[in-house]
């Protein structure tokens, strides 16, 4: 059974942690609307952190990595990868069970999309708390 999650209004790290646990347990997880995922902290601060990440590269041959994905779905995918033992067979199999999309592509637009209450912004941040959208980053 495939778990279809709607990323909009969820916090990046909390959603990623829950998704990572589920794929390790053997569930297939699909996350749609990754551009609507929230990150706590204001946009300027998150932008500085992301730009600092963009500066990290291999001096001798930058094309060998680290790879800096710009698309919101890939940023989320990488966040989940950091929570998995992705260099082991088990971790790779878990990553294969995860699919991420910006927007809602055809097979999933008809399916029921779930939310994760533990990762929702409205639950976790104060009403005045600052946050940024992954899509803007």
UniProtKB/Swiss-Prot annotation:
Residue ranges of the TM segments: none
One Pfam family matching this protein: Ribosomal_L13
Modified how: Phosphorylation at Ser-73 upon interferon-gamma treatment in macrophages involves a DAPK1-DAPK3 kinase cascade and is causing release from the ribosome, association with the GAIT complex and subsequent involvement in transcript-selective translation inhibition.
Keyword Ribosomal protein: yes
Chain's role: Associated with ribosomes but is not required for canonical ribosome function and has extra-ribosomal functions. Component of the GAIT (gamma interferon-activated inhibitor of translation) complex which mediates interferon-gamma-induced transcript-selective translation inhibition in inflammation processes. Upon interferon-gamma activation and subsequent phosphorylation dissociates from the ribosome and assembles into the GAIT complex which binds to stem loop-containing GAIT elements in the 3'-UTR of diverse inflammatory mRNAs (such as ceruplasmin) and suppresses their translation.
UniProt keyword annotations, A-Z: Citrullination, Cytoplasm, Phosphoprotein, Ribonucleoprotein, Ribosomal protein, Translation regulation
Protein name: Large ribosomal subunit protein uL13
Keyword NAD: no
GO-annotated biological processes: negative regulation of formation of translation preinitiation complex; negative regulation of translation; translation
Localization: Cytoplasm
Gene that this polypeptide is encoded by: RPL13A
UniProt superkingdom: Eukaryota
Residues where Citrulline is found: 55, 136
Organism expressing this protein natively: Sus scrofa
Family named by the database record: Belongs to the universal ribosomal protein uL13 family.
